[in-house]
């Protein structure tokens, strides 16, 4: 009898060789080093709320993505640090550990506490130079214990050579080189550990720009490329109780870059002095926008009940009736399909469960 010889299938041989290589790589570098996209169902991106309901909606995923780099930039006193502090407070509320690299040496503990930050459990560092700041950040991120880290600000990350040099010395491109090198090292660690890394940045103007926007951010172009989300925050007006009494700022945030959802969304909210982002103001604005609160002229009403004339009157009603505020917030979240439950409702549910 003649034996039938089967010819080897080149495709099978390729797949075998590929599997052997993957097994070898996983043995060396750990499981999941190389995998097919079909091997694992892509889960929703874990996020940290920004503390602004409108901004969470504008970001498309419900907040800032974990395991990614975020840049918040804008002019002076526009609310950059306030927004990042709200992110820290939200991360802490969710049981996370937060760190703040204060390169500007301007951290205000009292203000941070007013925004809801638990300062007793906040890790803070005030480094002497840019290299030290980024090394501290790298070690904290690589520990795998940090959920959110804020670096305030890129402009204050002064290279060691510049600090040690004379006042008039030219140090062209030193900071840009430092940022580029640091981001190359940090990106992988940030992604692996699932830490949300926020860089606060300042604006500068390019000299001699005749056409287009002369504004640019400090620290070179590296951060623009490495950031998954870039937020442009600006003050657009003042909130006054009377002609002489200014109580806050009207603020506009534009999602300039977003790798997680469609970008270029714009949101406006109030930042009140000593309070931060006004949650009530946002609920009123979003409630009207989504048709949950009815507005006729200057009068506001909800489910047939008149709330008052003007935003300030509605604000007072919500302060006296937090249950109504939470109910409207829940309806807003359901309408835009945003996960999460208002904090007061969550606390009430926990109390009921314990009872």
From Swiss-Prot:
Residue spans crossing the bilayer = none
Matches recorded under Pfam families? RecA, RecA_C
Which residues are ATP-binding?
Answer: 74-81
The record's principal subcellular location, in a coarse class, is cytoplasm
> What is the annotated localization of this protein?
Cytoplasm
Please give the SMART domains that the UniProt record associates with this protein.
AAA
Against InterPro entries, the record matches this protein to: AAA+_ATPase (IPR003593), DNA_recomb/repair_RecA (IPR013765), DNA_recomb/repair_RecA_CS (IPR020584), P-loop_NTPase (IPR027417), RecA-like_C (IPR049261), RecA-like_N (IPR049428), RecA_ATP-bd (IPR020588), RecA_C_sf (IPR023400)
Give the CDD domains listed for this entry: RecA
One Gene Ontology MF term:
ATP hydrolysis activity
Q: Which domain of life is it from?
A: Bacteria
Q: Which GO terms describe its biological process?
A: DNA recombination; DNA repair; SOS response
Keywords attached to this entry: ATP-binding, Cytoplasm, DNA damage, DNA recombination, DNA repair, DNA-binding, Nucleotide-binding, SOS response
Return the GO cellular component terms, semicolon-separated. Answer: cytosol
Task: Give the family per the record.
Answer: Belongs to the RecA family.
Q: What does this protein do?
A: Can catalyze the hydrolysis of ATP in the presence of single-stranded DNA, the ATP-dependent uptake of single-stranded DNA by duplex DNA, and the ATP-dependent hybridization of homologous single-stranded DNAs. It interacts with LexA causing its activation and leading to its autocatalytic cleavage.
Protein name (record) = Protein RecA
Provide the species name.
Cytophaga hutchinsonii (strain ATCC 33406 / DSM 1761 / CIP 103989 / NBRC 15051 / NCIMB 9469 / D465)
